[in-house]
Structure formats: structure tokens, C-alpha cells
Amino acid sequence: MTKKAIILLSGGLDSATTAAIALAAGYQLIALSFRYGQRHERELAAAKKIANFLNIKEHHLIEVNLSLWGGSALTDQSIAIPQEGINPDIIPITYVPGRNTVFISIALSLAEAREAEAIYLGINAVDYSGYPDCRPEYLDAFQTLANLSSKAGLEGKAPQLIAPLVMDSKVDIVRRAVSLGVPIADTWSCYQGEVEPCGLCDSCRIRDQALIEAGYPELATPLLKNSRGK
């Protein structure tokens, strides 16, 4: 019997790489993407591209409008996206309250319905500035919840939360993506929803730095490439 897994596919580099890792592990993937009122909704087009590239046949787009109450620069247009660089001492305003908990809960529901063995997550605790729901402790706690709150869990068959990149640096993620043939240029990481990535938000800065260090400057944002060309 083919083993199945759910992949949370945002359209970003991390989730695309995680999807490729899951496929390499022999899973038939079911992808979940979310329109949650994010200003960078452009990532959903990237998610579709990645799903098509990886030949993922079942791809669900779920509407969960977290912008109704805002609380984050990603879901509230009145809050500016920080562009002054990363401050590791604070939880940034780009943190979306409860987002991963909502997403993983829906993934757990789908996993039970499809009898999937695993839920693959592209979360990363190393290069991000303090998101509380991107930590190994959070994953462990949610696994306990899945074990206790589901029929599959009570039968000893709860879907396992797998986050293969959680302790990888972004440079390591870039290298894994390249080794797996992930089309990095088709992924979207920028917090803005413009035609081109801004090159200034935390996500762009982290990605650009990693691409440069890994030896792929041609994949960096136009802003960085232009500045290096001067």
C-alpha cells in the first residue's frame, strides 16, 4: 500500500524543499495551501507551480481569513512590513497569531480522513527571528495533542509531524533544495505581494544571504543583484 503524507505547501523555499524530501522518502503527497488574508498572496501561485512540478495530484486551497482580526503585518495592511533588518531579540510583527496551530489542525483533520501516516512541515527554527510556532518544543507539544485528540491517535496511529528542516540553516536548505532539483526560482518568500520580491523584508534578507553563501547569487532578489552589480 502506498504511504501517504500531507504537506503544508506555502509556495516558499522551505515548504517546496520539504515536499521534495517527502517525495524522496516514498510518500504520496496531498498538498494543503492557505489563503488566510496574507498580503503576499502571490505565494499561492508559487505553491501551485511547485505542486505541478512535483506532480502532486491532490492540492487543496483552504480559505481561513485571519485578516479579520489582524495582529500581524502579514494580515493587516495598516501595519508596515519591517525593512530595517532582523532583530533577534523580539518576536517580529510579521508573526501571525496562531497561524501554524490553525494550519496544522486542518492538516491533522485531512490526514485522519485520508489515513495519512505523516504531516510534513517546512518550519524552521534556526534562521527565523523568534516565531514561537517554529520551534521543536512546539512540534513536540502538537504531536502530543495529535496523539490525544484524534481517533487515529487513540488507536496508536496518529499522523507523525515531520519537520526535516527545523534545525537546518537557510544555507543548508538551499543546498538541499538544489540537490533535490527544487526549482528555487519558482518559489516565493517575500512578505510583500508585489511583482518582484522586495529584497528588504526579513524573509528576503535571510533568503538572499543564504543564496549568496551557498553560491547561487543569480537566484537572489533583483534589489540585491543590482546592488552587487554596481
Curated annotation (Swiss-Prot):
Zn(2+) binds at residues 190, 198, 201, 204. Binds 1 zinc ion per subunit. One of its GO terms (biological process) is queuosine biosynthetic process. It catalyses: 7-carboxy-7-deazaguanine + NH4(+) + ATP = 7-cyano-7-deazaguanine + ADP + phosphate + H2O + H(+). It comes from the Bacteria. GO terms for molecular function: ATP binding; ligase activity, forming carbon-nitrogen bonds; zinc ion binding. ATP binds at residues 9-19. It holds the Pfam family QueC. The keyword Metal-binding applies. Its cofactor is Zn(2+). Keywords: ATP-binding, Ligase, Metal-binding, Nucleotide-binding, Queuosine biosynthesis, Zinc. Pathway: Purine metabolism; 7-cyano-7-deazaguanine biosynthesis. InterPro entries: QueC, Rossmann-like_a/b/a_fold. Signal peptide: none annotated. PANTHER family: 7-CYANO-7-DEAZAGUANINE SYNTHASE. Belongs to the QueC family. Catalyzes the ATP-dependent conversion of 7-carboxy-7-deazaguanine (CDG) to 7-cyano-7-deazaguanine (preQ(0)). This is 7-cyano-7-deazaguanine synthase. The lineage of its organism: Bacteria, Bacillati, Cyanobacteriota, Cyanophyceae, Oscillatoriophycideae.
